């Protein structure tokens, strides 16, 4: 939740600054999320690998994997930073107004500075969650948020008394970069001072003689799992973020309304995502300890809890959607554009919760290739491809109620439902096969 609060702070502040800045935020966020989440997926392979090693009691080997994840994060940050500094492909897809483009570029420049810190912290987060220390992550993320909020307010709205101009969406990008590096330095200090990390020999821990040199065997193992994981996450995220890029063609008001609905969906997603991380960690640890029966039980229990909570949260937002949207904007046109999209969130969120839990339990078993195929078919094929055809009436058959942004949300919900059903059935097959073995 602390992670998505960064985006929520930006959305609320920018929505009250100008619709043009909100449109820039929607396209810029879509570009950054596409780059960051796709790269972060490769780093996330650290979680199930360390979880199984920790469950087997191989602490030094688990720590060695963290050193390799740092090298991987730095290399990926260089690649991703180039895409953010030179965002022409994203701008070409969005076809935004000329007045919006400079603001997108300025916002992404700040996020390019934030990207190395974000990927390094992803490695820190993956390790801590894998060894059942989520509080260490939560505290630092809340500290980053505490730095982010006042910085965003000052830089986005300005402080005339101090001669600081209102930078709008660009100021939010700068604030994110500062806050992310604060998190990384705080994480390094914690690794250095807390005795828990010493037996692992992780970077910065007491007694560790610096960063281990690249171990290409370990890096290959991480990439073998991380690449399909990263691609699967990239498919899911681009299916959502490219909605914003295509909806931007409709104008600033439709994309501003979409940004509000998208931020709500992302906020709701944080609960099943957190539960999925926790469930995946416990399942991986039980697999490492060779207790497959308990691993199966934990996986199914996690899915049941995620669906129950998703029903309550999604239903609550649906019933209170008018009041929720009013918290984001006082622009009646933007609110009118957002409300029909927010109405889809109940079914969207239920499917999202089911698919992410099933995918994470499969990752605990080090299975990522089949989920990638399912994601590509359901989310790119049905969600994004179908959404484009419906929203822009490619075949001349779209009813008026589904033209524009509503068509994208209709198709994306259908794609998520298909992904959820397919992943859950595949998980059932995997568990039955393990039981038979």
For every predicted segment, state its role.
Residues 22-81, 85, 121-132, 137, ...:
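Small-residue-rich hydrophobic transmembrane alpha-helices
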Residues 1-10, 110, 114, 121, ...:
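Transmembrane helical elements of multi-pass membrane transporters/channels
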Residues 4-23, 91-98, 154-167, 230, ...:
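Helix-terminus/linker motif at the lipid-water interface of multi-pass membrane proteins
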Residues 15, 52-55, 130, 165, ...:
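Membrane-helix boundary and inter-helical linker elements of multi-pass secondary transporters
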Residues 19-30, 104-108, 173, 252-267, ...:
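Small-residue hotspots at the loop-to-helix junctions and early N-terminal turns
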Residues 50-116, 150, 154-227, 283-348, ...:
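Short alpha-helical transmembrane segments in multi-pass integral membrane proteins
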Residues 8-12, 89, 123-127, 149-157, ...:
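Alpha-helical transmembrane segments of multipass membrane proteins
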Residues 43, 47, 111-129, 137-145, ...:
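Short runs within selected transmembrane alpha-helices of multi-pass transporters and secretion channels
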């Amino acid at each position: 939740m602390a992670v998505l609060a960064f985006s929520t702070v930006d959305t609320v502040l920018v929505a009250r600054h100008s619709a043009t800045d909100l449109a820039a935020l929607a396209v810029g966020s879509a570009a950054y999320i596409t780059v960051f989440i796709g790269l972060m997926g490769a780093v996330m392979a650290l979680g199930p690998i360390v979880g199984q090693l920790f469950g087997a009691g191989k602490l030094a080997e688990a720590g060695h994997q963290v050193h390799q994840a740092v090298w991987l994060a730095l290399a990926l940050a260089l690649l991703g930073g180039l895409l953010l500094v030179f965002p022409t492909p994203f701008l070409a897809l969005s076809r935004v107004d000329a007045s919006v483009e400079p603001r997108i570029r300025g916002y992404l420049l700040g996020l390019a500075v934030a990207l190395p810190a974000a990927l390094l912290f992803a490695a820190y987060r993956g390790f801590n969650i894998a060894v059942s220390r989520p509080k260490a992550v939560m505290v630092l993320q809340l500290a980053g948020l505490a730095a982010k909020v006042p910085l965003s307010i000052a830089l986005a709205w300005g402080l005339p008394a101090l001669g600081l101009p209102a930078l709008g969406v660009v100021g939010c990008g700068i604030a994110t970069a500062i806050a992310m590096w604060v998190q990384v330095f705080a994480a390094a200090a914690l690794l250095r001072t807390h005795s828990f990390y010493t037996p692992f020999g992780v970077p910065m821990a007491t007694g560790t003689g610096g960063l281990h040199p690249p171990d290409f065997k370990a890096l290959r193992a991480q990439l073998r799992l991380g690449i399909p994981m990263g691609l699967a996450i990239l498919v899911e995220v681009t299916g959502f973020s490219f909605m914003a890029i295509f909806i931007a063609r409709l104008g600033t008001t439709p994309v501003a309304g979409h940004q509000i609905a998208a931020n709500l969906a992302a906020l709701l997603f944080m609960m099943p995502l957190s539960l999925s991380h926790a469930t995946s960690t416990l399942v991986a640890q039980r697999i490492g300890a060779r207790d497959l029966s308990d691993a199966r039980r934990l996986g199914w229990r996690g899915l049941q809890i995620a669906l129950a909570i998703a029903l309550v949260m999604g239903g609550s937002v649906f019933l209170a959607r008018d009041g929720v949207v009013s918290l984001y904007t006082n622009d009646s046109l933007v609110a009118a554009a957002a409300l029909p999209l927010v109405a889809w969130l109940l079914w969207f969120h239920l499917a999202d919760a089911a698919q992410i839990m099933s995918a994470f339990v499969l990752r605990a078993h080090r299975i990522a290739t089949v989920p990638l195929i399912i994601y590509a078919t359901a989310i790119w094929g049905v969600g994004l491809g179908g959404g484009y055809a419906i929203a822009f009436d490619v075949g001349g058959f779209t009813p008026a109620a589904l033209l524009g942004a509503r068509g994208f949300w209709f198709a994306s919900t259908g794609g998520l439902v298909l992904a959820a059903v397919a992943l859950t059935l595949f998980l059932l097959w995997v568990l039955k096969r393990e039981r038979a073995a």
